[in-house]
Amino acid sequence: MKLTALHFYKYSEPFKSQIVTPKVTLTHRDCLFIELIDDKGNAYFGECNAFQTDWYDHETIASVKHVIEQWFEDNRNKSFETYEAALKLVDSLENTPAARATIVMALYQMFHVLPSFSVAYGATASGLSNKQLESLKATKPTRIKLKWTPQIMHQIRVLRELDFHFQLVIDANESLDRQDFTQLQLLAREQVLYIEEPFKDISMLDEVADGTIPPIALDEKATSLLDIINLIELYNVKVVVLKPFRLGGIDKVQTAIDTLKSHGAKVVIGGMYEYGLSRYFTAMLARKGDYPGDVTPAGYYFEQDVVAHSGILKEGRLEFRPPLVDITQLQPY
């Protein structure tokens, strides 16, 4: 098998409700897709999770495109016959995990039969608009992740009025400081499953007495398996959010899941406001998580998607089928 051609595509859809995070407000999701063609004419797609700007991570759509262009020129027409051999082709991309993850998503499909399956539904609420509340009422997720705002306690009270049981998670995106210690201590009374990344400087955890704030989860700092193990051994970290784009791809996450469980850590698979192709693989990995991952039903964030019926809500779970990318919706890039 050889790779003979590479095509780039752009796709953008408005969010049904703008995404309000501690770092940025998003109105649209711009996304890069790649299409790898093999010597038999088969096409395999990868969806990049990087954003247009570096608000979340230093890798952006433009930087990933540049890296993949160069990678393809270095590997065009090289022969490989196994998944393991294909992964050797991306050894040079260890320092650009978002680019590596995009390629690995396509390579994985060359050597694996993609299954149909179902997973628990884990919603993310950002800003808690009336439209989001109505969506939560209608879909009844197993887990709700609430993005931190100064109104966090009020928003939790609003969520507690919903007429179904759910696990509550808070995501702070490294935005808190010492002045937020009191709020964090109040959260400990709210049966919060865990809080993702409260502090930019993780050493601030040394200033907090054990048990006085919710359990801490790594997310932004979960950049490599070695770094993760070091942090869970140094600090009282119980949960790790694993994201393929941050670790370097599906294979890296699969290895990390097994290793971290052997260290006694709980694992969650994180999403990236994805379209249907990437959402399928996030859901596939989330089957091995200890808590519901960031997996939402088709139509939760966007009216349109390049993969139809990616995550159909049925009896409280999301059903996934092998994804088929509608290339007619993609714009050459």
From Swiss-Prot:
Q: Name one Pfam family in it.
A: MR_MLE_C
Where, by residue number, does Mg(2+) bind? Answer: 171, 196, 219
Q: Which GO terms describe its biological process?
A: menaquinone biosynthetic process
UniProt pathway annotation: Quinol/quinone metabolism; 1,4-dihydroxy-2-naphthoate biosynthesis; 1,4-dihydroxy-2-naphthoate from chorismate: step 4/7; Quinol/quinone metabolism; menaquinone biosynthesis
**Residues of the active site:** 147, 243
Q: Which reaction is recorded as catalysed by this protein?
A: (1R,6R)-6-hydroxy-2-succinyl-cyclohexa-2,4-diene-1-carboxylate = 2-succinylbenzoate + H2O
GO MF assignments = magnesium ion binding; O-succinylbenzoate synthase activity
Q: What is this protein called?
A: o-succinylbenzoate synthase
Write down the species: Staphylococcus aureus (strain COL)
